[in-house]
């Protein structure tokens, strides 16, 4: 989101001599990144090329009854000849001359011309031609004192401005106003000893009046922790004065009327949203802050009828709703030219509530942008007083009664303990205790307590993202200047360090492998909804890391696994007719130990992992049936991935995958340590139903720390290419259903020792031709001796041992 800041408006609050370009550079250096800087002129082009000139001679044109040939003094040694058709041109006049090359209006360029045979080198201008008036009765005649050669821009005193567009991050709502930007810039200038002064408008003249104000009733205190209403009677709604209109136009806002313009002005001045209601339209003479009725209909200012949810916070009167709180006003309660009495709302609304309503109704407004990110709860009173005083000044009227307020629980400023040595350790430079304190004072931090080694500070209420010491350190560092932290002259490192696998290289290798096999990488939000974990045993809800101030209940916990985010992606694609999905993700997962108090870091755990997903069927080909994604296809990818780093999947310890996540599958652990490496299988129907998925999904999750441990264990070794041929043999055996291929493979390699190189399963048969509870495996074996060519006797001896082992250990029968 971009915040538009008018340079001239900004200087109302910050006295300094910085040019717009210097202001933009300073803002970017302190974390308010300026995306664009645009010069704004009262008249487009600034009348460049138009100057004050004096008519020295004026004679009639010989071939015209209305044209005049004039000679003008422009300040140059030679007079300039201009043919003019204005009836009021005369010698001795001071006029505004558009010289050759000047562009007036959109595209009217002044050129050297010949009019009725006489050369003309410019144009003497009327008001409408310059864009400063509508008169075209004649040329614009200036006062005799006008100085020849003066640019028209300077003579007319045309205003210029600069529009600074700041790319605001979600945590910097404190800079979503001119005063907010001025505060930050003031701290920067003070730290750099640049003369400046911060001017915050005084509201001490505000005084409550006599009579009865419109009362308020807040029944949804959780949605409106602080709500105020000011009643102003006898206002005259009209067009705003020119200065106010210019300020709003400078940042792209359309002036409406003086009352509405004042609320918009204060919003962009202070950052506190306001709303003005026509008091005559408040039925029952009372304002109620409540939740909407489920299914309630409400027509907003844009004329759209909206269906409300019981979660929507509403501003209502005794009979019906008037406004979606903090989001959008209603069609029937707004201020019009007929309004004489105004109810002025200033409030602090629950950010989560506002965000959900804004998202639910697809309404993004300046007010909702600020409320959902956390407006300043302590600016509510100041903004209301500022707007009320401006309404009295520009629209007349009197404040009636006392300001009505609901503020049951006072919101206190956050207190943070600071250790100066730790701050300098984080910064990487000894900047001095005095510098730390001066920066914090310039940023309006209050020192609750000071010691020789640190301090206790109260954080300004508008800094909604500052909670901990590290947050304060970030504030200090951005004002001190990242560029002022010098790199050390020497870096200490061992020149004999053994080469180790680089995590980034390994991750890139994994990503390249998966992408080459048709997987698409996804990146999901680490925040998710707690409801996903309510029925899981493997990842129980009580182990979720909860967010203190979630923007939404859909984003109220950190994810414990990548599997659920992946199912969200698959459901999203299937709903858009993309049924064949192969994705992978690398990201962090988080968990909380409920047996601990949660106040220390050892209560929480974070680690990274990979997740792979296959679902659906690829597009059909004329050459080959691609087949549907299945369990064994996924297992094949996992096997190849592990083999890429020197790990045989059959060397891993296995156990059944958790049943709440997979209907069938395996969990793999590192041998010896039992450290979990991967889990894979067919996603359980209950999980698919949770996301509305009606086709099978096959998923795997791989622990990155365990995988990297494997990479470090398996060093690359040189192996000589075999000189002697390999021999292949097949074996078909009848087995009990309980016997697994992995068991057979492990036994085969134990018996075959150095001659057996590969074991494969190429056919499985179950059917009415064999007994119930039995299955037939067709196995392939590759044998090879590195020192000689195998004879038939050598091969038969190994195959006999294999068959004997299968018969004795597994009850196998040769087919």
Question: Where are these predicted regions, by residue range?
Answer:
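Terminal amphipathic helices with adjacent charged low-complexity linkers/tails
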Residues: 185, 189-219, 395-423, 430
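Beta-rich nucleic-acid/ligand-interaction surfaces
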Residues: 42-46, 205-207, 266, 494-495, ...
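Extended, well-folded interaction surfaces typified by the phenylalanyl-tRNA synthetase beta subunit core
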Residues: 416-581, 729, 782-786, 794, ...
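Mobile "lid/hinge" segments at catalytic clefts and subdomain interfaces of large enzymes
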Residues: 116-131, 135-141, 152-162, 166, ...
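A carboxyl-terminal module marker
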Residues: 4, 441-448, 469, 524, ...
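Conserved mixed alpha/beta core segments that line enzyme active sites in large multi-domain catalysts
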Residues: 51-83, 149, 245, 257, ...
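Glycine/proline-enriched, intrinsically flexible loops and inter-domain linkers
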Residues: 7, 25, 30, 42, ...
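Phosphate-backbone binding interfaces of nucleic-acid-interacting proteins
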Residues: 2-207, 343, 362, 366, ...
